[in-house]
Amino acid sequence: MSWQTYVDEHLMCDIDGQGQQLAASAIVGHDGSVWAQSSSFPQFKPQEITGIMKDFEEPGHLAPTGLHLGGIKYMVIQGEAGAVIRGKKGSGGITIKKTGQALVFGIYEEPVTPGQCNMVVERLGDYLIDQGL
């Protein structure tokens, strides 16, 4: 299965059969290389991925400045140290799950809820971890 298939079928899927989906998603290597992304995923700067990776290594690193992706600032909210970073911006937000080799991104807007985004992103991330990726 190609990385793009994971994005198209597992991240940009119909959530709970409700006809809702994430606004954008991607799978990005720890080095910032894009493995696959939705057409709506923002163009990001390498230093933004560096900052995200640093927060996984040193939880709380992004809290004072916020999480930036594609020039958009998200307020960092409770995640799981070293495993999941969550951010909020207005009625939307972002979930990032770290696997052994990749970062799985999900960006949502209402009516998708934070919990739905977390479920979609973390489910794929956990699967990739189980596969040794």
From Swiss-Prot:
Phosphorylated by MAP kinases. It is found in: Cytoplasm, Cytoskeleton. The keyword Phosphoprotein applies. PROSITE patterns: PROFILIN. Gene3D superfamilies: Dynein light chain 2a, cytoplasmic. The keyword Phosphoprotein applies. InterPro entries: PFN, PFN_euk, PFN_sf, Profilin_CS. Disulfide bonds join C13-C117. A motif (Involved in PIP2 interaction) lies at residues 83-99. One of its GO terms (cellular component) is cytoskeleton. It holds the Pfam family Profilin. The modification Phosphothreonine is found at T113. The variability of the residues taking part of IgE-binding epitopes might be responsible of the difference in cross-reactivity among olive pollen cultivars, and between distantly related pollen species, leading to a variable range of allergy reactions among atopic patients. Belongs to the profilin family. Occurs in many kinds of cells as a complex with monomeric actin in a 1:1 ratio. Binds to actin and affects the structure of the cytoskeleton. At high concentrations, profilin prevents the polymerization of actin, whereas it enhances it at low concentrations. This is Profilin-2. It comes from Betula pendula.
